[in-house]
């Protein structure tokens, strides 16, 4: 079993960048997205996702990233029905106002973009979840993706179980 990558700097060791203190591209701390420029890791052209390159990725507090636009929906849907490019390690109704935080780290030397949802609480219910997604540059804007689940205590944040996958 893989363990979450730490030692990335910042207040908790999972990255210098903190969701709750960042400028939101859409939504709020409960159902919001921030835009992260990924060119320091993937080069000036950006990251290639199924033939389209993006210089920025939207990190959503509800456990997913999107490429073409931010998402503010709190209810997860079947990933194949989402309709926009996305990768979801754990798309559910996360509410960091109730606990936890989201960190991210861009490491050009290692060629990684690491996003950590640390001790995040559900909108309704109890418990916390910790999980991580790492995008690794494999050259020419291409990448590999790794999901790491540390401690999952809940699967249903409000309506519907968590969704995992990509589209």
What is each PLM-predicted segment?
Residues 1-167:
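Extracytoplasmic Ser/Thr/Pro-rich, glycosylation-prone low-complexity segments
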């Amino acid at each position: 079993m893989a363990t979450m990558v730490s030692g990335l700097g910042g207040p908790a060791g999972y990255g210098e960048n903190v969701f709750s203190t960042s400028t939101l591209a859409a939504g709020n701390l409960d159902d919001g997205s921030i835009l992260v420029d990924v060119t320091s890791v993937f080069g000036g052209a950006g990251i290639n996702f199924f033939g389209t390159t993006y210089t920025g990725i939207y990190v959503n507090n509800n456990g997913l990233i999107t490429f073409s636009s931010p998402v503010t929906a709190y209810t997860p849907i079947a990933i194949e029905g989402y309709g926009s490019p996305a990768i979801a390690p754990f798309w559910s109704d996360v509410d960091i106002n109730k606990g936890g935080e989201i960190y991210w780290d861009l490491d050009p030397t290692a060629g990684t973009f690491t996003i950590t949802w640390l001790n995040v609480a559900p909108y309704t219910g109890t418990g916390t979840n910790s999980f991580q997604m790492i995008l690794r540059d494999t050259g020419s804007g291409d990448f590999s993706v790794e999901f790491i689940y540390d401690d999952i205590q809940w699967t249903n944040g409000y309506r519907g179980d968590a969704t995992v996958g990509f589209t």
